[in-house]
Curated annotation (Swiss-Prot):
A GO-annotated cellular component: cytosol
Underlying gene: pyrG
Quaternary state and interactors: Homotetramer.
Species of origin: Christiangramia forsetii (strain DSM 17595 / CGMCC 1.15422 / KT0803) (Gramella forsetii)
Keyword field: ATP-binding, Glutamine amidotransferase, Ligase, Magnesium, Metal-binding, Nucleotide-binding, Pyrimidine biosynthesis
Binding sites annotated in the UniProt record for CTP: S15, D150, I151, E152, K190, T191, K192, P193, T194, Q195, K226
Region (Amidoligase domain): 1-269
The keyword Nucleotide-binding is annotated on this UniProt entry: yes
InterPro entries: Class_I_gatase-like (IPR029062), CTP_synthase (IPR004468), CTP_synthase_N (IPR017456), GATASE (IPR017926), GATase1_CTP_Synthase (IPR033828), P-loop_NTPase (IPR027417)
Additional facts recorded: CTPSs have evolved a hybrid strategy for distinguishing between UTP and CTP. The overlapping regions of the product feedback inhibitory and substrate sites recognize a common feature in both compounds, the triphosphate moiety. To differentiate isosteric substrate and product pyrimidine rings, an additional pocket far from the expected kinase/ligase catalytic site, specifically recognizes the cytosine and ribose portions of the product inhibitor.
Name listed for the protein in its UniProt record: CTP synthase
E.C. code: 6.3.4.2
PANTHER family registered for this protein in UniProt: CTP SYNTHASE (PTHR11550), CTP SYNTHASE-RELATED (PTHR11550:SF0)
Binding-site list for Mg(2+): D73, E143
Residues reported to bind ATP: S16, L17, G18, K19, G20, I21, D73
Length: 546
């Protein structure tokens, strides 16, 4: 293809309708037809990135291969497409304004008065087209965060209006995702909110090319015709998005509705192939028809909001399908774990995952959970802070290093088995300054982790400031906590495992960021397999007792 095509996805009526899933589903269908597609998210908040946002505010912060701290929607994009994203795939208002102000300070605007139009909108247009100009993609899908009519989104909507005009009708289209609510008292679907949302979009100079209508009930032909007439779109471009059992059903739903066909027609692209979703559907078949189930406890500090651990939860879905088991995740708040509660909260589980996080709140509960898993041969996976808690627990209770801790929690600890990385000691700013992105790790042969990956060297994504303190490495290894993954450049210990335990692994990196439908992460696959084996063993033991 000579020119990259652009698709813009806007939202109306309500937030949380699933623009990211619709964008990812359309991209999947286009990819399955042989097109090279990528997805970009424009976020209208003033933070430069979500790296400093509380998970309760914004869900998880997703880290890309190049070290960008981004919106969790980029996780959906990668999981659907099995293609890496980068900093260019996530733009915030804060980053836009930061760039424009820096240009003004350098004198690049030659004394002009810097304004939202044209300077901010030009910067937005430039960021939108970065991915399309490198020749890697046939189609770039850009999701506009927020809801049409929000004051924060106005510069983005104006930039899209200008760009659509500049590119021409055959090179750009707008998909508007909206809500068609069902009023149970009246027993009918109501189209008026969608009509008003489309009108608001048109007041900004944009005519939607395709309507995707989120609904709890089927849209009748009469409803579709009504929406087509009053929203000024073709009836074939009124697409139904009914509530699904799983987000992974949505690509097939959009295929059935013909979203990809309408898109190709409007972009003057050839519609001469059928999307090949065989591999996707094999995953769905295994996911929906498990042969067994396991119960895994997720020990965390932000469990009230499941989006805080979105990539972990999706990784369990991928690993469960690979093992043909259903993974039932039980959310356990680490603040509520202590000596009197731990047996009731954990004893029935088939595995324990101690989740990432920051700060001292709930730390002792995580350490107690690690100890229970270690002493009871329960499959254990510690991620980032979870690995650090495993080192602290082992140091306290096996090495008998009283008060062993991380300097993040106790700056004056006598035994800093986890310490601030040397490169972080002069850092004062919080945003974008951690050890981020993909780093090499060499694996020890004859280890659990080497068997998991089946290779000698891996590259995984990181997001942390604190590290395993190598001063305690010899003591820990002599007592049975092995260092089986080492960064070749720094000597940083990135993986630990226990010598005399069925399956006990801690990793400093975030494996959940690299699990996709097409490539479930081997660490999660192995962990779920170990949990299933533990479940079978426990059931057999109970049967023997009878």
């Amino acid at each position: 293809m000579a020119d990259t095509k652009y698709i813009f996805v806007t939202g109306g009526v309500s937030s949380s309708l699933g623009k990211g899933i619709i964008a990812a589903s359309l991209a999947k269908l286009l990819q399955a037809r042989g097109f090279k597609a990528t997805i970009q998210k424009l976020d209208p908040y003033i933070n430069v990135d979500p790296g400093t946002l509380n998970p309760y505010e914004h869900g998880e912060c997703y880290v890309t291969e190049d070290g960008a701290e981004t919106d969790l929607d980029l996780g959906h994009y990668e999981r659907f497409l099995n293609v890496n994203t980068s900093q260019a795939n996530n733009v915030t208002t804060g980053r836009i304004y930061q760039s424009v102000i820096e240009k003004e300070r350098r004198g690049e605007f030659l004394g002009k008065t810097v304004q939202v139009v044209p300077h901010i909108t030009n910067e937005i247009k430039e960021r939108i087209q970065i991915l399309g100009k490198n020749g890697d993609y046939d189609i770039v899908i850009t999701e506009i965060g927020g809801t049409v009519g929000d004051i924060e989104s106005l510069p983005y909507i104006e930039a899209v209006r200008q760009l659509k005009w500049e590119l021409g009708d055959d090179n750009a289209l707008v998909i508007h995702l909206t809500l068609v609510p069902y009023l149970s008292a009246a027993g009918e679907l109501k189209t008026k909110p969608t009509q008003h949302s489309v009108k608001t979009l048109m007041e900004s100079g944009i005519k939607a090319d395709i309507l995707v209508c989120r609904t709890e009930h089927e849209l009748s032909d009469d409803i579709r015709r009504k929406l087509a007439i009053f929203c000024n779109v073709r009836q074939e471009a009124v697409i139904q998005s009914i509530d699904a059992r799983t987000i992974y059903d949505v690509p097939n739903m959009m295929l059935k509705e013909g979203l990809d066909k309408v898109t190709l027609k409007k972009l003057a692209l050839p519609d001469d192939s059928t999307p090949n979703l065989d591999r996707w559907n094999q995953f769905l078949q295994r996911h929906k028809n498990p042969k067994a189930e396991v119960h895994i406890g997720l020990i965390g500090k932000y469990v009230e909001l499941q989006d805080s651990y979105k990539s972990i939860l999706e990784s369990f879905i991928h690993a469960g399908a690979e093992n043909e088991v259903s993974v039932n995740v039980e959310y356990i708040h680490s603040e509520f774990i202590n000596d009197s509660t731990i047996h009731n909260k954990i004893s029935h589980l088939d595995g324990v995952l101690v989740a990432p996080g920051f700060g001292e709140r709930g730390i002792e509960g995580k350490i107690d959970a690690v100890r229970y898993a270690r002493e009871n041969d329960l499959p254990f996976l510690g991620i980032c802070l979870g690995m650090q808690m495993a080192v602290i627990e082992f140091s306290r209770n096996v090495l008998q290093l009283k008060g062993a801790n991380s300097t993040e929690m106790d700056a004056d600890t006598k035994h800093p088995v986890i310490d601030l990385m040397e490169a972080q000691k002069e850092v004062t700013h919080k945003g974008g300054t951690m050890r981020l992105g993909a780093w090499d790790c060499e694996l020890s042969k004859d280890s659990i982790i080497h068997a998991v990956y089946g290779v000698d060297k891996i590259k995984e994504r990181h997001r942390h400031r604190y590290e395993y303190n190598n001063k305690y490495k010899e003591q820990l290894e002599n007592a049975g906590m092995l260092s089986t993954g080492i960064n070749p450049e720094t000597g940083l210990v990135e993986i630990i495992e226990l010598k005399d335990h069925p399956w006990f692994v801690g990793v400093q990196y975030h494996p959940e960021y690299k699990s996709t439908v097409a490539s479930p992460h081997p660490l999660f696959v192995s962990f779920v397999k170990a949990a299933h084996e533990h479940s079978v063993k426990q059931k057999n033991a109970k049967m023997a007792q009878k």
